[in-house]
């Protein structure tokens, strides 16, 4: 279930303060955040936010198409190592 519409979108307070401060000064700095649950709002468009994925911060450039999504959607937390090679499996079984 989604969040109640009367509550509005969740955005981390400190992240929102940093975005507003950068908008006032007109600077374009990378903002580090651990708040993957924060929703992307129109004020964030044009900024680069480094979202933590559990191992490192992944830089995400915010565009208009991303509005309404969560920051965590753009920083995957799992690595896919790939499936085992079929030839390698057959060789192991014969030995």
Swiss-Prot record:
GO molecular function (one): rRNA binding
Keywords from the named record: Ribonucleoprotein, Ribosomal protein, RNA-binding, rRNA-binding
Xref: SUPFAM superfamilies: Ribosomal protein S19 (SSF54570)
Disulfide-bond pairs as recorded: none
Superkingdom: Bacteria
GO-annotated cellular components: cytoplasm; small ribosomal subunit
GO BP field: ribosomal small subunit assembly; translation
InterPro entries reported for this sequence: Ribosomal_uS19, Ribosomal_uS19_bac-type, Ribosomal_uS19_CS, Ribosomal_uS19_SF
Pfam family, one: Ribosomal_S19
Signal peptide interval: none
KW Membrane (keyword) present: no
Function text: Protein S19 forms a complex with S13 that binds strongly to the 16S ribosomal RNA.
Family as reported in the entry's similarity comment: Belongs to the universal ribosomal protein uS19 family.
Protein's recorded name: Small ribosomal subunit protein uS19
Name of the gene this protein is made from: rpsS
């Amino acid at each position: 279930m989604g969040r109640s519409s009367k509550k509005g979108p969740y955005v981390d307070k400190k992240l929102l303060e940093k975005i507003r401060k950068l908008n006032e000064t007109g600077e374009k700095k990378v903002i580090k955040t651990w708040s993957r649950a924060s929703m992307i709002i129109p004020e964030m468009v044009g900024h680069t936010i480094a979202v933590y994925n559990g191992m490192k911060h992944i830089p995400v450039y915010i565009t208009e198409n991303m509005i309404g999504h969560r920051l965590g959607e753009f920083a995957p937390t799992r690595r896919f190592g790939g499936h085992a090679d079929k030839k390698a499996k057959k060789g192991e079984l014969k030995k």
